[in-house]
Amino acid sequence: TFYRGIPKFHDIRTMFTIHNIQYQGQYGMEIAWDVLGIPEYQYPVLEYNGCLNMMKAAIMQVNVVNTVSPSYAMEIHDPWYSHGLDPILNAKGDRVIGILNGIDVEANNPATDEGIYQKYDVKTLEKKKVNKLELMKEMGLEPDENRMLIGMVSRLVDHKGLDLVRYIFHDIMGDNVSFVLLGSGDAEYEN
């Protein structure tokens, strides 16, 4: 996008996707020239709060900013969620959009999924409990169809709400509740 001023690139449109606004690519300004070879006249685009901020530069230079959902696109305009980039995003206005990402409903259809113990559909929901009981066995839990089983698949980082889960964990974990978590991420959660 630094080449937008060159006539042959004038009509090229660009988009930047934000998956997680917390990971902004922040470094000391000294690497702009020393490592990246970026000339000093372009520093104002790169610099934010005294450091090189690659996400800020990308947001400023692209035509459209995309996020993983419409609600996330709205959230990151708020100072609470933006990790300091709300003024830059707000300047983009309606050129910050969200396109919902999600699962492939054909590949993840419980009526045809070869990866589950018992196939089921909306008319045979009672078969679903076989999967619950088998998962409980696989996880070393006492199989009990009356026991609530909470499952969570996530990247194990604060941004995904693990700090909130940890905060309320003892309140939601009663005598008749089991919790299964699958993911990787920050060592404090993995351990």
Task: Give the residues covered by each predicted segment.
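Catalytic cores of nucleotide-sugar-dependent glycosyltransferases that transfer UDP/GDP/TDP-activated
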Residues: 1-191
